[in-house]
Amino acid sequence: HDCKHQPAPYFRKKFSVGNPVRSARIYVAVAGLYQLHLNGRRLGDTMLDPVYTRFDRRNMYVTYDVTSAIKQNENVVGIVLGNGWYNHQPLAVWNFEMAPWRNRPAFCMDLHLTYEDGSEETVCTDYGWRTTDGGAWRKNNIYTGEFYDFSMQMEGWDKPGYDDSKWGGVRLRQAPSAQVTSQQMRPIRACREYPAVKFAQLSDNAYLYDFGYNMAGVTRFRLKGAKGTVVKVRHGERLGKDGRLDQSNIDVYYRGDKETDPFQTDVLTLSGGEDEFMARFNYKGFRYAQVEASAPVEIDKESMVACFVHSDVPQVGEVRSSNKLIEGLMAASNQAYLSNLMGYPTDCPQREKNGWTGDGHLAIEAALYNFDGITVYEKWMADHRDEQQPNGVLPDIIPTCGWGYGTDNGLDWTSAIAIIPWNLYLFYGDTKP
């Protein structure tokens, strides 16, 4: 399929193990995003892997220790791929739809097995894999959301014994870049959950959740309705005068079709049973979530929680004061900073999700006083090296698909390449970045 094809690709491979296993590791590199499975279980607790890079110059691989998950006899490894930054489908103003790397998401993987007798075996990405686009993920995009059809879930697709005879074969292609490096940084996780502080029914089939805090992340929820009911979950930061969600402050750069591919909205088709959903290939900036259903659904205040998603950097500093306003301002500042840390520092978690260099270096001192973020900034400095032209020119946003070179922002922005390494040295004594 070409890059305009929307359903997410699923892949699976069977392999047999006949000897006791001493160790097993998976190394997986993906152009796009992924969710990795082994013998019916999703691996890891991270999100939005691998982190965003300039795909035609550097790709990241992630490592998993799966020794305890390997079984004797038949095993199955499976993966679902999301578009992420690799394959932008709706239009925005930064020309990502014209990125030189743009293509359908793809992956390569090695599963290294070491047996107790010292022998070794590698299960790799070859023609032995099977694939389909007939699963529940019908559409996904980093700016808009996910379309998920519960009636199309393939029960047991990632387990031994599943009949994949109707699945197709795979096609091999080159990696986007010859440089594939280990992702050595604090991963992105859903680090905190917020229950709704307010819940309101707006009409017969519309509901509003208020989580009390502005954040980057996703919602996790369960609901029940008739099979085929379409539920839209819209996310935003403010309400209009009518008490309904208002996205007009955050969708200003979006150029896609707001009816067929709405901004910051997950669109679900229900199975008829109790369905549970959490977006995996997308994140939003929001405080409120508005649920709109095509038919009645069973839903209440406890049906939905907000998941605060960001690079999982440990907090190393804090401010304590008898003045609660100061403490509140610091808490809000830290919440805003973490909402803009997704493997690189961003300007906002909704409108753009771009790594504006000026924003990044202006926040570096506040960042390092409060959080152990060196691995994120080491990665971002590598992104700077990927983007720097032979004459030294840098773009305004990093990573970029080519947008942002030759603007009038100048040193106020691109001095990030000096200011951030200098601050990493001041805080850590580290001369490497």
List the predicted regions and their residue ranges.
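Extracellular/oxidizing-compartment recognition motifs
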Residues: 1-351, 358-359, 375-378, 395-405, ...
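Glycine-rich, acidic and aromatic/proline-enriched surface loops and short helix-turn segments
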Residues: 32, 335, 339, 369-390, ...
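Functionally critical mobile loop/hinge segments
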Residues: 351, 355, 367, 381
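Aromatic-lined, polymer-binding surfaces characteristic
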Residues: 353-360, 386-398, 405-421, 425
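Well-ordered alpha-helical scaffold segments within catalytic/enzyme domains
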Residues: 362-373, 417-433
